[in-house]
Amino acid sequence: MTDMFRLDGKVAVVIGGGGGIGEIMAKGLAGQGSKVAVASRNMQKLEAVAQKIQSETKSEAAAFQVDIIDKQSVAQLVKQVLSKFGTVDILVNSQGANVKKPAVDFPVEDWDLMFQVNVKGTMLSCSEFGKVMIEKKKGKVINLSSVRGIRATLWGGNEGYSATKGAVDMITRSLASEWAPYNINVNALAPSLIYTELAAVTLRDPERLQKYLANVPLKRVGQPQDLVGACIFLASPASDFITGQILYLDGGLTAVG
């Protein structure tokens, strides 16, 4: 029986692939045989990641610079990827911005930044790469959401971030419905607290971390590697009958509250 999780011959684009969760997922997809295009602003980081992926997985990888909140830049990225690889089968939107400030003292510019990157960036990426997938009548889109899209925290400062992730959830569900006739699956990964730079504030506070883990059945913080299997699943033929779903990677957090 053919391995349903193999991605041989596929081309994946990972936005935000220059580090953190995006880099880990890009490497995971490449490990299953997919060619990978990593894209973000920092070309130096991207080139290092692409070289590392090629060295460790033997799959072809390329780096592309993009400003995800600029439509022309995203459209140019699509052209560059098509010129390099000929097609796009998988799109992963792993870009993200997270600023925590009290609601009564929340700078408008920080609010705008999160909505620009998390919401506008996701929609622009889906829109531009979606054109390619609609034409070929096949594709897999994986957005990066968060449990914060449906669940408040025990402490403040998450109003902006939570609102953007709720928006990502609805972009995901709406596109899943709109693009179903074109055989395009649109889903989202929604992790809880993951060991990344964005989670540093919580991880540095033992009391806050203890309160958080009290509500997590598996009693640990997630690792970037915990997202890889789910990403491969949603990118692979194994998930062909799954669309419009938000997959929670949270150690059981949303199951108990």
Label each PLM-derived region with a short phrase:
Residues 2-4, 231-232, 243-257:
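Short C-terminal tail/terminal secondary-structure segment
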Residues 18-20:
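Conserved glycine-rich cofactor-binding loop
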Residues 43, 65-77, 108, 225-226:
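The beta1-alpha1 cofactor-binding region of Rossmann-like NAD(H)/NADP(H)-dependent oxidoreductases
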Residues 102-103, 107-115, 141, 208, ...:
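Substrate-binding pocket helix/loop in short-chain dehydrogenase/reductase
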Residues 126, 164, 172:
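Active-site helix of classical SDR
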Residues 131, 177-181, 240:
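Alpha-helical segment proximal to the catalytic Tyr-Lys
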Residues 146:
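Residue(s) in the substrate-gating loop at a strand-loop-helix junction
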